[in-house]
UniProtKB/Swiss-Prot annotation:
Protein keywords: Hydrolase, Metal-binding, Zinc
InterPro entries (alphabetical): Clx_II_MBL (IPR035680), Glyoxalase_II_hydrolase (IPR050110), HAGH_C (IPR032282), Hydroxyacylglutathione_Hdrlase (IPR017782), Metallo-B-lactamas (IPR001279), RibonucZ/Hydroxyglut_hydro (IPR036866)
Organism of origin: Prochlorococcus marinus (strain AS9601)
Family, similarity comment: Belongs to the metallo-beta-lactamase superfamily. Glyoxalase II family.
Full protein name: Hydroxyacylglutathione hydrolase
């Protein structure tokens, strides 16, 4: 379990490498991409929270696998997902579109469409003094999501959108992939000191059984080769290369 005390965001490690994020305020909590339900229910009950909403970035089973059971336990919970995902996330009851804003836990949350990994992937952005982005599988520390349904152009454009956000944005992705991503980047850029430093930082955190996520956008732009790509051609080469990395 990991904490961000500035916004009371909690990370639950589940499955092999998933992280379920929960954000609490007073006695209400929202959960992002619940791949399973048991640890979420346990945490909510232990802390006497009320589940206000479930935020779904996309339809993959390791992101929605626990949602139905959470709905059974809290029938009035809001399930927020892309309006384009009504067939694949049929239990959504708040359908949203790119650019729309919602009030969640008393804060304004903006919907940002980040296509590429899937054809209707969205992210949830909270602005302010300590901006936060729940990005699902579009961006990882040192990497980006595989392109399953979208196009290279869509993913590249999505990353450009992310880069335009405030540089102090803290980014919450849904998987602990950092070390593998950094090792791949070092294979391509073996003399890059920023990436070398990142690997040392990551290995230290992992040795202490700590998560390497979330991560700051400003720092990520220095070490993430996908964010450093100058054009679509360079991005396409990098993504194709990463797909072959073992």
């Amino acid at each position: 379990m990991e904490f961000n005390k500035a916004r009371n965001i909690i990370g639950l490690r589940v499955l092999s490498d998933n992280v379920i994020w929960l954000m609490a305020k007073d006695k209400s909590v929202v959960v992002i991409d619940p791949s399973v339900h048991e640890p979420v229910i346990r945490y909510i009950n232990e802390n006497n929270f009320h589940l206000e909403a479930i935020l779904q970035t996309h339809h993959h089973s390791d992101h929605i696998g626990g949602t139905k059971s959470l709905i059974e336990k809290w029938p009035n919970v809001k399930v927020i997902a892309s309006s384009k995902e009504k067939k694949r996330i049929p239990f959504q009851n708040v359908s949203v579109e790119d650019g729309e804003t919602l009030n969640i836990l008393g804060e304004e949350v903006k919907i940002i469409e980040v296509l590429g990994h899937t054809s209707s992937h969205i992210a949830f952005f909270l602005n302010g003094e300590n901006p936060v982005l729940f990005i699902g599988d579009t961006l990882f520390s040192g990497g980006c999501g595989r392109i399953f349904e979208g196009t290279y152009q869509q993913m590249y454009s999505s990353l450009e959108r992310i880069k335009s956000l405030p540089k102090n944005t803290l980014i919450y992705c849904a998987h602990e992939y950092t070390k593998a991503n950094i090792l791949w980047a070092l294979n391509l850029k073996p003399k890059d000191q920023d990436i070398k430093n990142k690997l040392s930082e990551v290995e230290k955190k992992l040795s202490l059984n700590e998560l390497t996520i979330p991560f700051l956008l400003d720092e990520e732009m220095k070490i993430n080769l996908f964010l450093r790509a100058k054009n679509l051609e360079e991005f396409t080469f990098l993504r194709a290369n990463k797909d072959l990395w073992v």
